[in-house]
Amino acid sequence: MIEFVYPHTQLVAGVDEVGRGPLVGAVVTAAVILDPARPIAGLNDSKKLSEKRRLVLCEEIKEKALSWSLGRAEPHEIDELNILHATMLAMQRAVAGLHIAPEYVLIDGNRCPKLPMPSMAVVKGDSRVPEISAASILAKVTRDAEMAALDIVFPQYGFAQHKGYPTAFHLEKLAEHGATEHHRRSFGPVKRALGLAS
């Protein structure tokens, strides 16, 4: 892994996404500028934290960060653009939503969206960069809450448990009940459930 050198600027934003793999719902992104004067203990990749810990950290991040913002791309945008381009768009929206313009942006992963300031992609950034860890927590808590809300409307699919990912249970219910308007029609299993696959 390439050694990560932290940029020598004051206002660094971290950006991460949640929800590229699910068959349903938006891809959700977050951008966070942390306050060096108000450190947050225990930041890590959201997937390595318990749900309870994520919820506590989410509130602390919102309270202590200099600026934070959420972005998203809806299922119809994912279907129109493809998941990669929709994710880049959602990241651009998260950065644009910051009320303080960052001097530098660190993106989790291996590619950066076009931004009006310098940026760098950091592989496994959600475990290596506190700003990206914070962004991953905000994005995951937000998307998980959306899946729990969708589960109330469509209880037969089990969205609260699998968060829209293509588990055996989700695929079984998709075949049984068909797709909701929140499913991504360009994704193979959804296409097949709708009889659109060639």
Curated annotation (Swiss-Prot):
RNase H type-2 domain segment(s): 10-198
Role noted for this protein: Endonuclease that specifically degrades the RNA of RNA-DNA hybrids.
Cofactor-binding details, from the entry: Manganese or magnesium. Binds 1 divalent metal ion per monomer in the absence of substrate. May bind a second metal ion after substrate binding.
Protein family per UniProt: Belongs to the RNase HII family.
UniProt binding sites for a divalent metal cation: 16-17, 108
Keywords associated with the record: Cytoplasm, Endonuclease, Hydrolase, Manganese, Metal-binding, Nuclease
Gene Ontology cellular component terms for the protein in this record: cytoplasm; ribonuclease H2 complex
Gene from which the chain derives: rnhB
GO biological process entries: DNA replication, removal of RNA primer; mismatch repair
Record's protein name: Ribonuclease HII
First-listed, main subcellular location of the protein, grouped into a coarse class: cytoplasm
First-level EC class: hydrolase
Enzyme Commission number, as recorded: 3.1.26.4
Cofactor(s) this protein cannot do without: Mn(2+); Mg(2+)
Matches recorded under Pfam families: RNase_HII (PF01351)
Domain of life the protein comes from: Bacteria
Gene Ontology MF annotations: manganese ion binding; RNA binding; RNA-DNA hybrid ribonuclease activity
Catalysis: reaction(s): Endonucleolytic cleavage to 5'-phosphomonoester
Subcellular location: Cytoplasm
